[in-house]
Amino acid sequence: MKELGRLITAMVTPFKTDGTVDYAQAQKLALGLLDSGSDGLVVVGTTGESPTVTWEEEHALFAAVKSAVGNRGKVIAGTGANSTQEALENTLKAEKIGVDACLLVVPYYNKPTQEGLYLHFKTIAEATKLPCILYNVPSRTITHMNPETVIRLSQIPNIVGIKEASGKLDDIAQIINNVRPDFTVWSGNDSDTLPMLAMGSYGVISVASHLVGNQIKDMITSFVSGNTEHAAAIHRHLTPLIRSLFVVSNPIPIKYALNYLGFEVGGLRLPMTEADEKTAALIRESLRGYTIDLPIK
């Protein structure tokens, strides 16, 4: 579903000093991301600490960000769960709030079969009018959704695309070759954006775009317009920064970077912890080599 955009940022969830969600700062961040290259935003995905944000907080964040963004960009609600019924109910609530699409992660911990994955996503998609984006991230979910399952799911009309974060480029090529023509594939790893574009993907659902959104957008636009040398140069330039943002579990590094740069997003909820000094020093050193696109003040 190409109207959702080529560059989508998976937003962090800002917290106040008392640990409650800072909805006003989430709105400010959303607008800043749109001002620095993002076409759309994922609200309460992995980067948004979905495991430790309550359903009520999630729904309030969906509403707050959609209210702030209006028609300036697309809002994609992270509504996935490892319970089909919970994911379905959360998706229906997001639809009622008025978001533009939903992101549905592969169920984690309970390790469903490929048939279970198919039925999970089919059940949710058939219950909602929202465009549904699949999310394959086996490094977090353990279960890998096979290309054959994705291809099968792509025949369901409102399953419109996939965030592919497996890093398995052979599988991704098989998906791109066999899904229906309007099914959209986004990279789910910043480091794979350009390689996947070369294979026929559409864009990226990014973490690094919190900081360098305009530069990532330039890379994508350059590649699509045929200026592959410029796109490759940007990719090489951004690689050290991207590496530093994943030196420990996301979103620990990106939250540290934003706070360090002066855009306050608060801490993390346990069991996630803040960056230790070794990690913080590495991120600070990495940031020195880059122009930051996000409006900080």
From Swiss-Prot:
Pyruvate binds at residues 47, 205. It comes from Dehalococcoides mccartyi (strain CBDB1). Gene3D superfamilies: Aldolase class I (3.20.20.70). It is found in: Cytoplasm. Belongs to the DapA family. Pathway: Amino-acid biosynthesis; L-lysine biosynthesis via DAP pathway; (S)-tetrahydrodipicolinate from L-aspartate: step 3/4. It comes from the Bacteria. One of its GO terms (cellular component) is cytosol. The active site is at 135 (proton donor/acceptor), 163 (schiff-base intermediate with substrate). Keywords: Amino-acid biosynthesis, Cytoplasm, Diaminopimelate biosynthesis, Lyase, Lysine biosynthesis, Schiff base. Its EC number is 4.3.3.7. Pfam families: DHDPS (PF00701). Its main location: cytoplasm. NCBIfam families: dapA. InterPro entries: Aldolase_TIM, DapA, DapA-like, Schiff_base-form_aldolases_AS, Schiff_base-form_aldolases_CS. The lineage of its organism: Bacteria, Bacillati, Chloroflexota, Dehalococcoidia, Dehalococcoidales. This is 4-hydroxy-tetrahydrodipicolinate synthase.
